Amino acid sequence: MELDTFLYNLHFDTDKLLPPDWQPDWEDAPLPYKLYRGLPEIPLTADVPLTLKGREANSIPSLEEFGHYLWYVYGLTRYSQAAFIEGTEEKATVSYAQLFRRFVPSGGALYPNELYVYLKLEDVPEGVYHYDVAHHRLIFLREGNYDSYLSRSLGNRYNLSDCFCTVFVSTVFGKNFYKYNNFSYRLQGLDTGVVIGQSLEVADRMGFSTRVCYQFLDRSINHLLGLSEQDESVYAVIPLSIYNVDQFNIEKNISISATELSREVPMLKHVTYNRSKRVIDYPELKEINKASMFETTHSFVNIKQDIPLNNALGTELTILPFPEVISYDLASVCRERHSPDIDFMLGKISQTKVSTLLHETFSFSYQKDLYNTQGKLGTGLNMYGTFYNVEGVQDGAYVYDKSTHALRRISKGDLREYMQNSLTVPNVNLFQVPLVLHVVGDKDHLKKELGYRGYRIQQMEAGILVQRLLLTACALEMGGHPLLGFDSNQSDELYGVNSKEKTCLIQIPVGPYRPRVWLKGSLNS
């Protein structure tokens, strides 16, 4: 399949992504976490704090504190069991799903990502580690100082000697491919973005400075971690420091090669276990991952800054009231947050609550390597949505104008039936949801600037925005459920974004919900 066709089908013709006889092999499902065998282990305390209060920003964290960071970002936090009724009324059977949950959402709770860290803390040997979420511990992969190696892999744009840690967020292709087949590629970028978003939130609470690096020499980074690019590849690199992680200009006259750089450190050959006995091939994912890689630093670019929203979208303007100043404990919000489905409960939403939700979501910005600037910039994404039963806002479709903090109406009326009918997987009753929001981005997925790598970067940025939205919604006593099971063509037509070369990337119903009936238990001391 041509890669452009593959990306098109991911959004607009998803049926063509799956073989006609595709059935997930549930019995041979891989583990939702990676396990290494025969390597040194460094246990982390399970006695994590129940609140995340600000810490001293001028002190390097201890190993205990860093373990808290990892647990709140991606640790196993909850065990849950839910009952499902299957079959007919005459012969119904009850099955139970038992899941290990984390504080971030993931498509099918499959969690395709893994975390690796290059640590320089007093309590542990300097080197590269894997975060073993199953046992909340670090697995020692490679010893040594790799500041120079990593700096060159990132284009010599950062002083990593000031960073006590560099986090690597990877994607293991097979962890959700066994269920979603080629559609898993879309999920992998979004899931990675959600993990990045959570890591930024936790780092902020713990007084760490961050910068998200989307541009790096893939093969040299994968080589350092001992990853096979056929199975797993790093999607983002996040330096952590107690100082600002400043970015220098790219040295255009100097080209650094991943192949040459990789020769500086020996190859790792560690044994891992993932439970699956049958190996499933995914040629399209391998091909697009290969096409997305940067071999030399000459491929690094500074793209143009965010384009302001075109005010021609919508003629009727609803100025939103001043948002409430909200301050919440991230730890308690993380514990409360989940993705309602049949639990949504229709209720009237105040205009102030909508104002706060949108303002808080888009006021978030972060340091990244896409622009030649030291400032913090948001994403090139916008928020559209259908509104029903919102105080002071007529029912209809709207776009959020960030520059004026206002809603521009696109069409009038109760659009709940339209939204419900556009679901390809109707697992949410949208008649009970007052806000159905869509993150909208460029239809070319940044390909002009970044090639095929631009697609996964756009998906990651959408995931970061979604995580911020979900946390804010929970702090406002509402729930949100990220969905990809919707018809993008219908949503794009409703909002009229086709003419702007935009498309809906992900759908998030948001609203009040009733408590869910389930058995769950916390996995911390």
Where do the PLM segments sit?
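N-terminal accessory segments that position/regulate proteins before the catalytic core
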Residues: 1-465, 476, 480-525
